[in-house]
Each structure stands twice: as C-alpha cells, then as structure tokens.
Amino acid sequence: MANIMNKTLKTALLVCALLLAAACSRKPSFVSVSDGQFIRNGRPYTYIGTNFWYGPILASDGQGGDWHRLMQELDTLHALGIDNLRVLVGGDGPDGVFSRVEPTLQKAPGVYNDTLLVGLDRFLAELGRRDMQAVLFLNNSWEWSGGYGQYLEWATGEKTLIPLVDGYRPFMQQMRAFQTSREAQELFFNHLKTIVGRTNTVTGKAYKDEPAIFSWQIGNEPRCFSDDPEVRDGFIAWMTEAARLIKEIDPNHLVSTGNEGFKGCEDDMELVERVNAIPGIDYMTIHIWPFNWGWVRPDALREDLDAAMDRTSRYIL
C-alpha cells in the first residue's frame, strides 16, 4: 500500500513539475493583429485606454515621484475598466526649458537620468500586476518633451523655437529639417535602441519579453510639416528605419507610428496611406482635436457637441 502511495505521489509531483516547466517556458500573451482585429490569447481583443504620459515620473524616487498617487491612480483606472495607458518614455534635453515637461529622461545624447529609467521599470511592473498595458512612445514632433527640436538642436547647435513664444508656424517650419537630418535621426535611433533593448530592473525581463507593453509608438504625432516631396520622402524613410529597428530588437510587440491621421499628414490621404503602409507598422492611429481644429466654439461647447461628434465619425471613417 505504501509503495502504491509513493508511486502515486511521485507521479503527481512529476506531472506538477512538467506543468510548471511548460508554464515557465510559455511566452507571455502578446497582442497581435489579424484581419483588422487585435488578438490576445487567440481571441479578438478590445481595450479602453487613456493618456498617462507622466507614469514613469510618478513611479520614480526622484523629482516628481509620488508612489502613493501612482497607486491610487492606477487602481482607480483599473477599477473603471481602463487597461491601456499611452505613456511618454521620457523627455529629451535639459530641464528648465519653457513649456517642456520635467524632469527629462535623456539629458544629453545617450546620457540618462537613471532614476527615471528605474521609474519606467517600476511603472511597467505595476501595470503587469494589474494586467494593464502601456503604449510607449519614443519621440515627439512637438516641443513639450524635446523630440524633433531637441535632436535637431543637438545635431546642429541651432536653438529650437518654442511655439508659445515664437509662434507655431515658425516652429513647424523649423521642424521640417528633422525629416532630412541624418545626424538628428541617428541620435533618435540610438535612443530608440537603448530603450527598446532595455531589461527591466524590477521584473528581470527584457522589454521585448515584457507583457505589460502593448506596443511601441515611434512618436507622439510625428509629422513631416511640409508639402515638399523630398521632405515627405525623408519623413517616410526615417519612420521606416525606426519601425525596422524596433522590430529587429523586439519582434514580440506591436508597432504604430502615433501619427494623427489626415490632419497629421498635411490633409493628404495619399501621405496617410504611405505612413500606414510602412513595413512593420501593425495598426493605424488617429487623433481627434475638435477644439483645436475649430469644430467647436469655446463659448458654445454644448451647442456644438452633436456637430463635433458627427465630424469626428466622418473623420474616422
């Protein structure tokens, strides 16, 4: 009888060990795309998301860090059913620049605030504990996190204009140069490789194996800011290179451009199609700015709401 029990126990332990080994060797459930649908765990997948650009700053032990606030906000969002957060990896350039978020992550080319890098790690770990995911964007066509302008400034030494000081039109004209500046683009690509190739110091997972990452986004609203064919070709070329690099380092996660759509492509549907036909781009993004685009009046928001919703529906379709 004892021998039978021992054999049964050994068999049970062996089965448990095999199941545990299989579970440990199984890759996390990354999201994929198929026939215009997100797929997770073999089933169509939908989510509710929001912007949460400052998450890694809150998660850090340095300037701007607030762990209690982060826990409260993540728990509140999770309870509301919001499980996908769009997050800035980190700002570029020195602190103290008007209209730029701070503290910044990349102080100079390849020089990082390590406290914020760990903050990003901790943030992703907390998302994972709640089965939430992040869309991580790496660059920015606008000034508020450095982005195009800071890379150009590092590459050329020319001071970046600030839209709220110098005007949006002069700023956008200056930003066209990023599309054809190989030096500025290389600085960004180096940053991309550093972040996408990182290993999480909290979970021990390489970012490419991190289930808390939903996708990489090349930038926040990347634009070419030009009708010039040469500039547009440069725009497509550097984003093609960025998508290739991300997929080369991390074949597990989705990649998107972060582009606004029609408005982000100089009101040119041909450019929209080119942007979203870039190899390695898994899904299209669209941003809606009814107020900024004049679809609603500041003193008549309620009256204009239905018309704005109609224009939004037509814009998406």
Residue ranges and their predicted role:
Residues 2-13:
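Bacterial N-terminal signal peptides that target proteins for export
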Residues 16-19:
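Repetitive helical segments and hydrophobic/amphipathic motifs
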Residues 22-23:
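C-terminal motif of bacterial Sec signal peptides marking the signal peptidase cleavage site
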Residues 28-296, 302-316:
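Active-site mouth of glycoside hydrolases
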